[in-house]
A protein has these predicted regions:
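C-terminal membrane-anchoring or membrane-association module
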Residues: 374-398
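Conserved beta-propeller blade signature
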Residues: 59-61, 119-121, 170-172, 219-221, ...
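A detector of repeated loop/turn-to-beta-strand junctions in beta-rich toroidal repeat architectures
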Residues: 46, 76-79, 105-106, 127, ...
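Blade-level signature of beta-propeller repeat domains, shared across WD40, Kelch, NHL, RCC1
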Residues: 322-355
Length: 398
C-alpha cells in the first residue's frame, strides 16, 4: 500500500501555529463483475479479443480475431470485425467485415473513441492502415496506409498497436515493429513521430504495444512489450522514466500488451503471459493485481493454442478471474474491461478504492514555537498480432 504524506500549516489566533501531516494511501482492489462474449465464431462470440473500448452509453466494442483457413489463407467470413455489446452484455451487432475494401478489416487490433470528435478508430493489421468510423459505425476513411512496419524475424506481432488521443483530438497510434508512435490529426494527416529506436535504454523500445495518454498530465504511457516494462513520455514525446521488470512477482511483467490510465493516473497493465492485470500509480509503484492462469483438470496451467489449432485454450477454464493470457484493456466509470486472449471473452472488473483513504489520527507531540504552541498531528495508515503457443520462443525475446 502506497503512503503519501501531506503537510498543512495554519495560524490560529496570535502566536499559535498548527502543523498537520496526513498520510494517505490507496487501498485499491479489483473484483470480478461479469463476462462479455463467449468463445466461438458466431455472432456475439469472440476469439483472440485484442482492442476493447466502451462508449459514453456503456456499450462495449471488441476487436475480434482474424479468420484463417487451415492452410493459413484468410477466411473473411470469420471474425475480422468489431463486435458491439449492450451495457448488460447483450450482442447488438458488428462494425466492419472481413476484406480489403473500405471499412473492411484483415485483423482488427486496437480500437478506441476520439473523445473530441466521437469517431471510432481501429487498427487494421494486414491491410496496414487505420480505419475511422463515426459514432454510429458508418465508415469515414482509412489513413496511414502502408505506414506501419511489417513482420520482422523473431517476432510474432506487427502493425498498428495501441491508439490514443490528446485533449485536442489528435490521434496517436503505436507502430509495433517500427518502435515508434505516429501522430495524426483527427482526419488522418500525419503530423509527427515519437521514438523509432530499438533497444533497452530509456526512450528505446522492443515492441510498442499498448499506448495511452493520461487524461490528467497528458503524459504518454506505453507498454514496451519485449522489454517487459512500461515507458512514460511527456506530452512532447520526451522519455521520462520506466517501471516494471522481467518476472512474475508483484510489479513484474512478462510481455505487457494492453494499458489504461484513469482520471487519477492509476495505470492498468495487461500482463499477458502472466495471465493477469496489474495496477500501478503514475510513478510506477505497484498497487494491486488480479487474475490467475487458466487450469486444466490436473491443476496445471492451460497452454496457449498451437499455430494450427483453433484459437482457444484446451480445455477452457471460464472460472471468473482465470485467463489464458490477457490482451486489450479499457477503463470506464469504475470498471476495467480485460480481454481473455485465448478464452474468447472479456472479463469486466469493478475497480474499488481509487480514492485516497483517511485513517484515524493520533496526537504525537506538543512543542513551543516562539510565543505560541504547535500541535503536530500525524495520520498514519498501516496498493496486434496474436501470440501462439510458442512459449519458450516468446520468452527468449523477453
Amino acid at each position: 500500500m502506497g503512503l503519501v504524506k501531506n503537510l498543512s500549516i495554519g495560524i490560529l489566533g496570535t502566536g499559535f501555529m498548527v502543523l498537520a501531516t496526513a498520510a494517505q494511501a490507496k487501498a485499491m482492489t479489483l473484483n470480478y463483475d461479469r463476462s462479455i462474449g463467449s468463445p466461438g465464431f458466431g455472432p456475439g462470440q469472440l476469439f483472440v479479443p485484442q482492442g476493447i473500448t466502451v462508449d459514453n452509453q456503456g456499450n462495449t466494442y471488441v476487436a475480434n480475431g482474424r479468420g484463417v483457413n487451415p492452410d493459413g489463407t484468410p477466411n473473411y467470413n470469420l471474425g475480422d470485425n468489431i463486435e458491439k455489446f449492450s451495457p448488460s452484455g447483450q450482442y447488438i451487432g458488428a462494425i466492419g467485415s472481413g476484406g480489403t475494401g473500405p471499412g473492411q478489416f484483415d485483423e482488427p487490433t486496437t480500437v478506441d473513441f476520439n473523445p473530441v470528435t466521437g469517431d471510432l478508430y481501429a487498427g487494421d493489421v494486414h491491410n496496414n492502415r487505420v480505419n475511422q468510423f463515426d459514432s454510429k459505425g458508418n465508415f469515414i476513411r482509412s489513413f496511414a496506409n502502408g505506414d506501419f512496419t511489417g513482420l520482422i524475424p523473431g517476432r510474432f506481432f506487427f502493425g498498428p498497436s495501441g491508439v490514443t488521443f490528446d485533449k485536442t483530438g489528435n490521434v496517436y497510434v503505436g507502430d509495433f515493429n517500427g518502435e515508434r508512435i505516429l501522430k495524426f490529426t483527427p482526419d488522418g494527416k500525419q503530423i509527427g513521430v515519437i521514438g523509432g529506436k530499438v533497444g533497452t535504454a530509456l526512450g528505446e523500445t522492443k515492441g510498442v504495444a499498448g499506448v495511452r495518454i493520461s487524461p490528467v498530465s497528458g503524459n504518454i504511457f506505453l507498454a514496451d512489450q519485449y522489454n517487459n516494462r512500461i515507458q512514460v513520455l511527456d506530452p512532447n514525446g520526451k522519455p521520462l522514466y520506466t517501471f516494471g521488470s522481467t518476472g512474475s512477482g508483484p510489479g513484474q511483467l512478462l510481455q505487457p500488451i494492453g494499458i489504461e490510465v484513469d482520471d487519477q493516473e492509476n495505470v492498468y497493465v495487461a500482463d499477458s503471459i502472466n495471465s493477469r492485470v496489474q495496477v500501478f500509480d503514475k510513478n510506477g509503484k505497484f498497487l494491486t493485481s488480479y487474475g490467475k492462469p487458466a487450469l486444466d483438470a490436473s491443476g496445471k496451467p492451460v497452454p496457449p493454442p498451437g499455430l494450427t489449432d483453433p484459437p482457444f485454450g484446451n480445455p477452457l477454464d471460464l472460472t471468473p478471474g482465470k485467463f489464458n493470457w490477457t490482451g486489450g484493456t479499457s477503463y470506464k466509470n469504475g470498471k476495467l474491461y480485460v480481454g481473455d486472449f485465448f478464452q474468447g471473452r472479456v472479463q469486466v472488473l469493478n475497480v474499488e478504492g481509487r480514492t485516497q483513504v483517511p485513517e484515524p489520527s493520533s496526537i504525537l507531540g506538543l512543542a513551543l514555537l516562539g510565543f505560541g504552541a504547535a500541535t503536530v498531528t500525524l495520520r498514519k495508515r498501516g496498493q496486434q498480432k496474436p501470440v501462439f503457443s510458442l512459449d519458450k520462443e516468446l520468452q527468449k525475446q523477453c
